[in-house]
Regions:
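A glycine/threonine-rich phosphate-anchoring loop and its flanking beta-alpha core
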Residues: 10, 113-212, 306
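C-terminal charged capping/lid subdomain of soluble metabolic enzymes
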Residues: 304, 311, 315-387
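ATP/NTP phosphate-donor binding region
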Residues: 1-92, 345
């Protein structure tokens, strides 16, 4: 393992009633003016929005509404939120939803405290914000684990770049699995695959020998797969939903990255594909992973073979590591189809042109943590194999 320092500041409230437990415990630290941030209308239809507003107003808080945060949140939306937070002198940001809402609010929290544009501050000047409006998260859609860290992925619609930002670290997160019962099935499965993707991208980093971080990772992957299969048959199974909500948190709270240099190449490709096509993140990952891994497995056959044996139950007797690895990738792709997720861009309803695929390949970040650093020509080849 690599050397590391691990500091985990997010306070988690998990289980039935976690939302109220968190609000009651944290209300005193929220200040007078609370920005309530959310996505579309689902939080209002389910009653979560009204319940949270009632709790806040009953405690004497002034509520500032910041809704309409879209999937794949835009830089413009983040700037809108930051301007509102400054204008209303917001003391606390309460983000209700999933990864897109949380990512947007992390950037809002930082931008509201900066005198200059955060994109220039971070990307051009290489500086990191140090002052934030404090924030908390209520999870109604799991999968991204975004409530567990300070990373954010934001789309700049002018440049078609889906870029990474560092914003606020949430002070706390409420994870009540019952709040995910109303999530549409396809959307939930997409989020669950994002969790599996986070695990795989951490596992396939380096070092590639056996270590306790990878042991934990492979166990979580098995748990995600087992519970996705349960949800595929019974999407109201609260126990399986609970497992997947916690799996999502574990995948992104840093535990699976301890002592590792991670590989997030699939995410980098999907980020740019999504920036150009506005397609669903988790579904795009489901399409990209098998194609990408068929290119990476020959460079790290032992690592892929272990994953194939321990996660997918591939019988390795009489087979070399690469054969075992490729069989594991085939099982991953079969599983994706069984879960009702797409196995090609065409199944997603996406028909990107060669020109678009070249733009994606030419602009996506190439990571150095995976089995090999891809050339852009190979990224284009992978994308064509996803069609």
């Amino acid at each position: 393992m690599n050397s590391f320092t691990y500091d985990y500041p997010v306070r988690n409230y998990f289980g039935e009633g976690a939302m109220d437990q968190a609000l009651d415990a944290e209300m005193g630290a929220m200040g007078r003016t609370v920005m309530l941030a959310y996505g579309g209308g689902s939080v209002k239809r389910t009653g979560v929005y009204g319940h949270v507003v009632d709790k806040l107003t009953s405690a004497g808080k002034r509520v500032v509404d910041f809704g309409g945060i879209m999937p794949n949140p835009t830089y413009e939306k983040c700037q809108e939120g930051a301007a509102l937070a400054r204008e209303e002198q917001v003391d606390f940001i309460l983000a209700v939803g999933g990864g897109s809402v949380f990512d947007c609010c992390k950037v809002v929290s930082a931008q509201a405290m900066l005198d200059e544009d955060i994109e220039t501050f971070e990307h051009a000047d290489g500086k990191m914000p140090s002052s934030f409006i404090p924030m908390g998260c209520i999870v109604t859609l799991s999968g991204t684990g975004a409530e567990q860290n300070n990373g954010a992925v934001i789309t700049n619609e002018e440049t078609h770049v889906k870029g990474a930002y560092l914003g606020a670290m949430p002070m706390w997160a409420a994870l009540d699995p019952a709040l995910t019962l109303t999530v549409p099935h396809a959307q939930f499965m997409s989020g669950a695959f994002d969790t599996l993707s986070h695990c795989m991208e951490s596992y396939f980093g380096s070092p590639r020998g056996r270590n306790v971080t990878d042991d934990i990772n492979l166990a979580i992957q098995r748990n995600v797969i087992r519970n996705m299969r349960i949800i595929a048959d019974d999407n109201q199974n609260l126990e399986a939903l609970s497992e997947l909500v916690y799996d999502s948190a574990m995948a992104e709270n840093g535990v699976l990255k301890i002592g590792k240099s991670t590989d997030f190449q699939a995410h980098m490709i999907q980020h740019q594909y999504g920036a150009y096509t506005h397609t669903n993140h988790g579904m795009g990952l489901a399409v990209i992973h098998p194609a990408l891994y068929r290119h990476l497995a020959p460079e790290a056959p032992a690592q892929f073979a272990r994953w194939a044996r321990e996660v997918w139950g591939v019988d390795a007797k009489g087979k070399d590591d690469l054969t075992v690895a490729l069989e594991g990738i085939d099982r991953l792709q079969t599983f994706i189809g069984e879960m009702g997720l797409p196995t090609s861009f065409a199944e997603m309803g996406s028909d990107a042109s060669d020109e678009t695929l070249h733009k994606v390949a030419d602009t996506c970040v190439l990571t150095g943590g995976c089995a090999k650093k891809l050339e852009r020509s190979e990224v284009f080849q992978i994308l064509t194999e996803c069609l």
